[in-house]
């Protein structure tokens, strides 16, 4: 009898968090609002010095969110390359322009980087103007780096080809599921 995809999913998560792994499983992150809140917290923690200890206001965080709306995976990839090893967003606070570090390439596999795993994320249909039928989707496993979804994984058991997972991701792209905070997925 083929293994259930939910079991494969659980084994993957267990493998990623096993031992001295830096990955943390976040079963509490299920919606886009949860993900934005988590990203905001990590961004503020990693930039306390630049923020002078003052958290981002809602208006300032809207500036950040607007910068993270990528029109393509390529545009997201360009941003992720960063400048001088740092991936940044910029916030106007009164008369000051703040440069907040989202990722520091020197902190990969350590430093201030935060590695998290989510599963069964609810990708709700939000595009009422789409020609595609309205469908909510549930993503299998997504890997977050500093709160941003970076890697999306659709798992298949032995009854289904890995190409079925590939086609499923292509379908999600066509349905516009990789938008908002998910627009940085690579």
Named regions from a protein language model:
Residues 1-186:
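An alpha-helical interface "stripe"
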């Amino acid at each position: 009898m083929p293994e259930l995809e939910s079991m494969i999913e659980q084994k993957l998560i267990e493998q990623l968090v096993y031992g001295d792994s830096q990955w943390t499983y976040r079963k509490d992150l299920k919606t886009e609002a949860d993900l934005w809140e988590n990203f905001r917290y990590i961004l503020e923690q990693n930039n306390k010095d630049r923020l002078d200890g003052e958290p981002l206001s809602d208006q300032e965080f809207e500036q950040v969110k607007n910068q993270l709306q990528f029109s393509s995976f390529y545009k997201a990839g360009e941003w992720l390359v960063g400048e001088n090893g740092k991936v940044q967003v910029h916030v106007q606070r009164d008369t000051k322009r703040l440069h907040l570090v989202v990722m520091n390439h020197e902190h990969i596999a350590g430093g201030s980087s935060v590695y998290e795993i989510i599963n069964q994320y609810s990708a709700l249909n939000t595009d009422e103007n789409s020609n595609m039928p309205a469908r909510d989707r549930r993503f299998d496993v997504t890997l977050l780096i500093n709160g941003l979804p970076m890697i999306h994984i659709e798992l298949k058991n032995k009854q289904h080809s890995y190409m079925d997972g590939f086609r499923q991701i292509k379908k999600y792209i066509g349905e516009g599921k990789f938008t908002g905070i998910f627009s940085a997925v690579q």
